[in-house]
UniProtKB/Swiss-Prot annotation:
The keyword Ribosomal protein applies. This is Large ribosomal subunit protein mL52. Keywords: Mitochondrion, Ribonucleoprotein, Ribosomal protein, Transit peptide. It holds the Pfam family MRPL52. Belongs to the mitochondrion-specific ribosomal protein mL52 family. Component of the mitochondrial ribosome large subunit (39S) which comprises a 16S rRNA and about 50 distinct proteins. One of its GO terms (biological process) is translation. It comes from Drosophila pseudoobscura pseudoobscura. The keyword Calcium does not apply. One of its GO terms (molecular function) is structural constituent of ribosome.
Amino acid sequence: MLQIAKLCLATSGRITAQRYVAVTTARAIDQKWREAKGLPENPNAFGPLTNLPDYTFLDGRPTPLGSNQKKRLERQQEIATKIVELSGELEFAKQRYERQRVAAATEKQRIIQNKLKPKGHLMLKQKK
C-alpha cells in the first residue's frame, strides 16, 4: 500500500507527490504467544500435519513414509545417536576427573607422610 506523505507545490504550478514505500513486513504469527504456550516458532515445522501420514489404508496396511517424513526420522535418529555418544563421553570424563582427583589426594598424602621426620630424643618421645 502506498501512502502519499507530502504534497509539494513547485514554482511552476505543478503538484508533485513524494511516496514512501515500507519495506518491512509485519510478522503474521504472534511469536510471543507461541513461545508462552510452548509451541514452535513455525507451526508447519512440527505437529500432526507434518508428523502423521497423509492418508491411511482402510484394511489396516501401514502407510509408506513420505520423503520429508523419512528425512526427518533419519535426522532424529542421527541426533539421538549423537546424544548417546556425547553422554557416554561425558560419563567417561566425569569418572576420569574423579580418578585424577583421588590420585592427586593420595599423592599429596604420600608426600606429607614422606617428609623429614624428627630425629633423636623427639623421635623416641613420639613412639611412646
